[in-house]
Amino acid sequence: XXAKQSMDGNTAAA
């Protein structure tokens, strides 16, 4: 997807 993600690749970054 286009949304940025955190290091784990699962949780969306704020």
UniProtKB/Swiss-Prot annotation:
On the 2D-gel the determined pI of this unknown protein is: 5.7, its MW is: 89.1 kDa. This is Unknown protein CP 7 from 2D-PAGE. It comes from Clostridium pasteurianum. The lineage of its organism: Bacteria, Bacillati, Bacillota, Clostridia, Eubacteriales.
